[in-house]
A protein has these predicted regions:
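Polar, glycine-rich mid-to-C-terminal structural blocks
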Residues: 121, 133-134, 140, 144-211
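Short, solvent-exposed loop/turn elements at domain surfaces
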Residues: 11-13, 35-38, 170-171, 221-223, ...
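Cleft-lining beta-strand/loop regions that shape enzyme active-site pockets
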Residues: 1-157
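Generic recognition of long tandem-repeat/solenoid scaffolds
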Residues: 27, 161-162, 222
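Conserved functional hotspot residues or short segments at active or partner-binding sites
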Residues: 174-175, 179-359
Length: 359
């Protein structure tokens, strides 16, 4: 008999932390969980030992989580006494959250990346840093979720979530988008952004001019529908060709990369001792392309005309093979190499004149 004991599988909230270039660190947070703050401190200290002087904090696609964790993270970047967020409702007295003196990165250059998938706790962090003139916000308008809800459990196991208050940024703006129309209209709002061109053009961003606020540094910010970035970066629909997208989402590229890495593991690990060596030197050659073509034929991927010259193919294969050898330490740096928002963040951090915060 074989006894199998289930092990604990940790779910991390920091996807990756690495140096984009000398002096500039990058940390991507996917959710605000109970362990996020401790994970951040570890990642921050690791990057500091590698010489990090400036930071890119990636909150894109981060749907939120615990308020406490968002406050702890924002506190790392704000000086003692500065307001982070406050909550208030008709029957919910105003409660203000302020920064303490424990922040470890209060004076260095900081960029925060957001997009339409950044919500709730992500918006609390981005809003606090924007309103205090502490960070340059880059990307696209965030989701717009700023409600405080209390959960009431019912006898049948279901629950009711009752809205009791709203979150407000330090300047007093609500980040909650309107929900005075139908429920369908509320949930379709993100699709409307796509239809109206907001994901591709900064001029198409809908802002309520009646809800203008001024930061201490004199910057105009808007309430009533998410965080509007200081620097807009459009959605990139051309990063990968349609063929590459089809092969990727079908799982064929993942399975090929897994088999390739497994078959050549000893050779590859002998040649590339570390993730940085793999990132800088591993390339996709003609033999590998022919192997993939044969693999696709064996999997009967009918209708897919693959040449190996498709946009993004080499990049995504390198990233997938790298993930099988070095996990996220190779996967994300390769995948992010031509990420428009990250490239813009690096450009801003290199050029002090582009930083939108008041020193």
């Amino acid at each position: 008999d074989i006894t199998i004991t289930r092990g604990k599988i940790p779910i991390y909230s920091i996807d990756v932390a690495y140096m984009v270039e000398p002096g500039i660190g990058f940390i991507k947070i996917s959710r605000f969980a109970g362990t996020t703050y401790d994970e951040y401190l570890k990642a921050f200290n690791d990057l500091s030992r590698q010489g990090m002087k400036k930071l890119i904090l990636d909150l894109r696609g981060n749907g939120g989580g615990f308020l406490r964790t968002a406050v702890e993270l924002a506190d790392e970047f704000l000086a003692d006494g500065l307001q982070i967020v406050y909550t208030e409702g008709k029957a919910h007295p105003k409660k203000v959250y302020k920064a303490s003196s424990k922040g470890g990165f209060e004076n260095s250059d900081l960029v925060v990346l957001i997009d339409e998938g950044s919500a709730s706790a992500s918006e609390i962090v981005a809003g606090a840093l924007q309103d205090n003139d502490r960070a340059t916000i880059i990307g696209r308008r965030s989701f717009g979720k700023g409600l405080v809800q209390d959960q009431i459990d019912l006898p049948d196991g279901s629950a009711v979530r009752l809205t009791i208050a709203r979150y407000y940024t330090p300047t007093g703006r609500s980040i909650q988008k309107p929900y005075d129309k139908s429920l369908d209209a509320y949930y379709n709002e993100e699709y409307e952004r796509f239809e109206h061109g907001e994901l591709y053009n900064a001029d198409s961003i809908k802002v309520d001019k009646s809800k203008q606020y001024k930061t201490p540094g004199g910057k105009t910010v808007y309430g009533g529908g998410g965080i509007v970035p200081d620097v807009f970066v459009s959605l990139d629909t051309m990063k990968f060709s349609p063929v590459v997208n089809k092969l990727y989402y079908s799982g064929l590229l993942n399975s090929f990369a897994f088999e390739y890495a497994d078959q050549h593991r000893a050779e590859l690990m002998n040649k590339y001792k570390t993730a940085p060596q793999f990132i800088s030197a591993f390339g996709v050659d003609a033999r590998m392309i022919e192997s993939l073509k044969a693999y696709l034929v064996s999997k009967k991927s009918n209708g897919v005309e693959f040449s190996g010259r498709e946009t993004g193919f080499a990049q995504i294969i390198r990233a997938l093979v790298g993930r099988n050898l070095f996990d996220k330490d190779a996967y994300y740096p390769i995948l992010n190499a031509n990420d428009a928002a990250i490239l813009k963040a690096v450009e801003v951090l290199r050029d002090a004149s582009q930083i939108t915060v008041k020193k």
